[in-house]
Regions:
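Structural preference for beta-strand elements that scaffold enzyme active sites
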Residues: 49, 76, 107, 331-335, ...
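N-terminal glycine-/serine-/threonine-rich beta1-alpha1-beta2 phosphate-ribose binding loop
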Residues: 1-46, 310-314
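NAD(P)-dinucleotide binding in Rossmann-like oxidoreductases
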Residues: 170-175, 185-257, 267-276
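C-terminal helix-rich "cap/oligomerization" subdomain common to oxidoreductases
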Residues: 26-28, 185, 260-316
Length: 463
């Protein structure tokens, strides 16, 4: 209230009151990282356009949900990397042609680091608030080198082929400092650094042999030097060229104006940082942090806002459902494979979206993901209380255990992992020409009579 009175602006008692206001068209989310997802999600649900600070969310699973919902509701959503809307960045991209003729390797180097003397519960050091150097400032050189590597290859942005990282962790578990090496192609690589306990050069250098481009202030673009910024170019001929720029508008003003113009032109994404670019950035931030073996509490489903988002209730019904003889449940014409989800949060994100789209069949197997396919699906089914609404296809007796005696114990183990009473459909995962089909059928008939399965099928059988 004091802040509102000081600047003569309206204040609200809650997020819901704020988002329910008909006077608000768009919101800028600048909370600690851990609250980006919920604030942006609620804003999008209320059909408010969103400019959200980087990183968009705590992980790539949360960002998938936001981007998908924004596109579905035709709401503008932009991740706020302020340097993307500044003319200096456009100047950098326009000067990359100096590397067109080089046959040598191109190295992109970027750093962003500062020394913060803060307590362990400060957002920079608190894992519950999304602390750490990578999420706070490492995202800048990561996003920039992907942008540059992309334009060097005539792409909007580039996907690294690999990332390796080293660094130091805080006693709180967050990363204090990290260096990462990214390989984009046989010719293009990047080395990036970030820190929250060490002042770094905070610059961008692109080099290849005798050719180089140096940007002394790539992130703030002269915002704190009276708007003055410059790019130094060393040509192969030895000529040194400086491209200067004086900004009289302001870094963050430009970002706000860019977002506003996008909204006024009825765009749902920015042309300086697309939704695909944002999702790619989030994915590689995840990979970088995994390289550092950082354990983030919010990446556990019990702590994740994905659990509370209940995105499965957003029914778009894109998929047609039909009656399936032998079952008293509706079946979608498409089944979701539960074989490659990498975590609980990933599984909940994907399963929620599939169910919300009208998907009702989930296909798992005893061998999938070393049993985690069953476990993740079971956690989701029971958390969302959907056992009576969906159809579970289970499979067992895969080679080399494709024999009747393995079927029942593997079904029982799958049911234990799934924490459900029975499989709606059971399929033998492989065939075995050395075992008579009748022996498989006899075993399955007994299991069906026990009430452990309803329908019987086959998968990967030779006809």
């Amino acid at each position: 209230n004091d802040f509102a009175k000081l600047f003569n602006i309206q204040s609200f008692a809650s997020l819901q009151d704020f988002l329910s206001s008909e006077d608000i068209d768009a919101v800028y989310v600048a909370t600690p990282h851990s609250d980006h997802f919920i604030c942006a999600l609620e804003a999008i649900k209320h059909h408010k356009h969103v400019l959200c600070e980087k990183p968009l969310t705590m992980n790539a699973h949360e960002s998938m949900i936001l981007l998908d919902l924004a596109q579905s509701l035709k709401v503008f959503l932009m991740e706020a990397y302020m340097y993307r809307a500044h003319p200096q960045t456009l100047n950098i991209l326009n000067q990359l042609s100096i590397f067109n003729e080089t046959n040598e390797k191109i190295l992109i180097e970027g750093s962003f680091g500062f020394q913060a003397e803060v307590s362990s519960d400060h957002r920079l050091r608190n894992p519950l608030l999304g602390g750490g150097a990578i999420l706070d400032v490492g995202c800048y050189p990561l996003s920039m080198c992907k942008l540059i590597a992309g334009h060097l290859q005539d792409l909007p942005f580039a996907e690294p082929k690999s990332i390796t990282a080293t660094g130091r962790l805080d006693k709180t578990g967050v990363d204090l400092q990290s260096d990462a090496h990214l390989v984009f192609s046989d010719q293009i690589e990047a080395k990036i650094s970030c820190a929250i306990d060490e002042q770094l050069l905070n610059r961008l250098v692109i080099s290849s042999g005798d050719i180089s481009m140096t940007v002394s202030d790539p992130w703030h673009c002269g915002q704190f030097q009276e708007g003055k910024s410059s790019i130094a170019i060393n040509h192969a001929s030895g000529l040194v060229e400086e491209i200067s720029y004086v900004d009289q508008i302001g870094l963050f003003t430009r970002e706000i104006e860019h977002a506003s113009n996008c909204i006024l032109n009825q765009k749902i994404e920015s042309d300086v940082i697309s939704h695909a670019d944002t999702q790619s950035n989030m994915f590689w931030l995840d990979q970088w942090r995994q390289q550092m073996q950082i354990v983030c509490p919010k990446n556990l489903i019990k702590n994740s806002p994905v659990l509370e988002s209940k995105a499965f209730l957003n029914q778009t019904n894109k998929l047609e459902n039909v009656n399936l003889p032998g079952l008293d449940k509706l079946a979608s014409r498409l089944a979701f494979g539960c074989d490659n989800q990498t975590s609980e949060v990933h599984a909940f994100t994907m399963f929620d979206n599939f169910y919300g789209s009208g998907g009702r069949i989930f296909d798992t197997a005893y061998i999938y993901n070393n049993g985690m396919g069953d476990k993740y699906l079971g956690q989701w089914i029971n958390s969302r209380q959907l056992e009576k609404e969906i159809i579970v296809i289970g499979k067992a007796a895969h080679t080399p255990q494709c024999e009747p005696q393995f079927i029942r114990p593997q079904i029982l183990e799958s049911l234990e992992r799934l924490q459900i009473k029975k499989l709606d459909i059971f399929c033998l995962h492989r065939d075995n020409s050395e075992v008579p089909v009748a022996e498989f059928i006899d075993a399955l008939t007994e299991i069906k009579e026990e009430g452990l399965i309803d329908l019987i099928g086959a998968s990967n059988w030779e006809l």
